Amino acid sequence: MGGAVEEKDGAGSSGRLESLAGNTAVPDMRLELVPIPVSDVDRAKAFYQQAGFGNLHDTQVTATMRVVQLTPPGSSCAIVFGTGMGPITDMTPGSVKGIHLVVADMAATRAALTARGIELSDVDDMGGVLYSYFSDLDGNLWALQQWPAGYQP
């Protein structure tokens, strides 16, 4: 296996990795939906709406299949939970840990979430990168992350 070289196209899209051996580049793939295992769909829906997630889609597909999608503010990636969705809903509630929500202003985000009744950890400063954590009612753990000023990830 050859090494990898990251090439950015001029359109500002994510980089494509190509092998030095000349393998075909893999087209862009967007992360659009992350499953969150919950024990009670309505309770989870209320929590995430309380946390400011929007763009709600709540569909009873069949008598046993319900799909709920919500999107964090400013994100193009949504979360999904529900019933009857096979391996997605077979995951253990509370087993997802460390999904990162990148924020521009940790203090403002914490203040807004606290005002909405969301409990957050104290802020951890890890070399200029700030973190604060919250969990949903099942224990799925979310990380708020703020990059240092001027950092371009």
Predicted regions and their residues:
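Amphipathic alpha-helical segments
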Residues: D40-N55
